[in-house]
Amino acid sequence: MLGLWKTWKALSDKGIMGINRRNADYVLKYNKRSLYPIVDDKIITKERAIAAGIHVPEMYGIIETEKQIEKLDQIIGGRNDFVIKPAQGAGGDGILVIADRFEGRYRTVSGKIIGRDEIEQQLSNILSGLYSLGGHRDRALIEYRVTPDPIFKSISYEGVPD
């Protein structure tokens, strides 16, 4: 327990904070509640950022219906790596990060090999609202995979640090 406290203190001394502190001290304090529906939707947020001239990972496509899942190959084209996210997910739930593809299979960043059927199931789960903030129907965003600089490896866990 003492080791955990020392680690937390060392990170805090370097200006690194946990997500709960970030939310309490910054997100809740400096953001209007009326704007939450905009920022809670990754697609709307991305579109607004682009319109404002802010650089964001390239959006390859959006899937809004079960029928559109058929367009996955068209959306990802020849790309070997990409990310699928629920538009209104939270805390990283529902995000599928593909690091490579070969012979009709896909490798996730954790090294798991999956098939097209598993990607389609993930998309269907996203659309059904399994990962959305309110449990309602959602959209799936397919975008460029950001790979963090190795400097963040020791302070981040499962994902790209904010």
Residue ranges and their predicted role:
Residues 1-18:
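Conserved oxyanion/phosphate-binding beta-strand-loop segments in alpha/beta enzyme cores
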Residues 22-129:
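A conserved helix-loop-beta module that forms one wall/lid of the active-site cleft
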Residues 78, 111-162:
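Phosphate-binding site of ATP-dependent enzymes
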